[in-house]
Amino acid sequence: MCQILERVMPMDELIERHTMFPYYGRFCNKDKKKEAFESLVNMDANHKKILPIPIMKKEGERFLRYCPMCAKIDRNTYGEAYYHRSHQMVGVNICPIHKCELRRSTVAVVDNRLSRLEVPEFVIPNNAPILISNSPIECQLAEYIYQLFQQNVDFDSEVTIGQFLKSKIEGTKYLSVRGERRYVSLLYKDLCKYYQELPQHTVPEVWLLQKIFNDQKINVVSICQLCMFLGVPVDELTCLKLPPKTQTELFEEKAVEMRKGGMRFNQIAQELGVCTSTIQLIGKHQPRKAKVYTVKTHEKRNWEQMDHTSVERQIHC
């Protein structure tokens, strides 16, 4: 099978351009990303254990989806309809291009079972209803995710998505002044308000946000919702990078500098907007100057000379 496919294009290009790997694999860490990609190249099905592909237990069986407007264009352009991978992004329910509701076909997305070849031209109807989304925020989010989906996958960055997101809330009200405490409940509240017109009001809850920040869970739509809310450009998500220094490091450096300038702990605390104990704690962790000990040296005493001098004194007395 691999040899037949490679006659058309290289296997790595086929995976990046014609599978869902860029959607599910983009936010995996470096090692898992490479492992999943190699699994797809080798076609050993091990990628299912690595990639965060959701198991649709509540919703039941998943089916391939299509956009009625895309199908019409395909028929006029190519003579037949076909499936688009951009319509299979779980969590995105409208076409990113035409903003109409995606329709469900009769072709199930199977797992370990053998599937029959279902030609899209015979499955996708000509008269499917076209329902345009009336939610601007849903359209904006779908386009944001689609733009990211089209980008190349970076295999070199060591930065995890959790680390990246932490850096993006630095300097905001969602992180303490020192940068060591996240206010996730406040973030969740603002996310709900920002996405209140999103159909089904699907916003990541507090527990999921915590897991995403801690690199314990990957949910593509939730990550994109968070990034779009924080104003992160799509380009920055294609190659994750961190600032030279964290907010915590910058805060501590400033506190130390102010201390060296002669300010007292309480003055520094008041200036930086934290409690005095926080500044004192930073001061304790700073290396102290080593004390310089001096050793007094004495000339070596001549005991014989001292005895002779002592005897002479006694005679004269």
PLM regions and their residue ranges:
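Basic, alpha-helical nucleic-acid-binding regions used in initiation and control of genome expression
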Residues: 1-317
